[in-house]
Regions:
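Short, small/polar residue-rich loop motifs at catalytic or cofactor-binding pockets
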Residues: 151-154
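C-terminal accessory region of radical SAM enzymes
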Residues: 88-138, 165-190
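Short, electropositive alpha-helical surface patch
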Residues: 49-66, 121-141
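A structural motif corresponding to the C-terminal end of an alpha-helix
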Residues: 26-38, 62, 95-111, 162
């Protein structure tokens, strides 16, 4: 996926490079021209949450089929970026859910994920139950299947860092399962 940090000047300011948004847009267009499926990745922060509608418009206008919205996990450079308040996170989810429902009604089947916040699935389920959505049962089944997203670490996904060290996922760098330079991955993962 191609990373965006907002639309236009918001992206450029975060990246510290004027014109970097246009370079990302060019990347999407070039991938599309050669038939390369390309997704969009964006970490929600206080610096870009106000662009949510514009980001969703961009996704629609560029016919992007897979989108990952990450909730900020403040580490490294992210420590300096403000995480969303609970209200901002819920508003972002409401905006996202409403747009996905519009896309679905229009026959646009996009894969939209939210990452690093297992509460998003529960929030969606509670909203569906409140609205009497026929999708609530399917959502509940998916949440039960993957443990709400919290149980996939070390089971459904793994992270192998640049040194060959195996971690339960990309966010559990403090937990080491071994090194693929010394052991077969299948021995470490079994």
């Amino acid at each position: 996926g191609i990373s965006l940090d907002g639309i236009g000047a918001v992206h450029d300011k975060f990246r510290g490079v004027k014109g970097s948004f246009e370079q990302a847009v060019r990347g999407f267009k070039l991938c599309s021209e050669v038939g390369q499926k390309t997704g969009l990745r964006l970490t929600l922060t206080r610096n870009n949450v106000q662009c949510m509608d514009q980001i969703l418009d961009f996704i629609d206008a560029n016919d992007i089929q897979r989108v990952c919205f990450y909730h900020l996990v403040p580490t490294g450079r992210g420590v300096e970026v403000q995480t969303l308040t609970q209200e901002e996170a819920r508003n972002a989810m409401d905006t996202l859910i409403a747009r996905v429902e519009e896309w679905k009604a229009e026959g646009k089947n996009r894969e939209v994920l939210t990452v690093t916040q297992p509460a998003d699935g529960i929030y969606l389920l509670l909203r569906q139950l409140r609205e009497g959505s026929p999708l609530a049962k399917e959502t509940l089944n998916l949440l039960q299947w993957n443990g709400g997203g919290a149980n996939s670490s070390g089971r459904g996904i793994a992270n192998i860092d640049t040194q060959g060290v195996v971690h339960p996922d990309q966010f559990w760098q403090s937990v080491t399962l071994g090194n693929v330079k010394n052991n077969l991955f299948s021995d470490l993962w079994d």
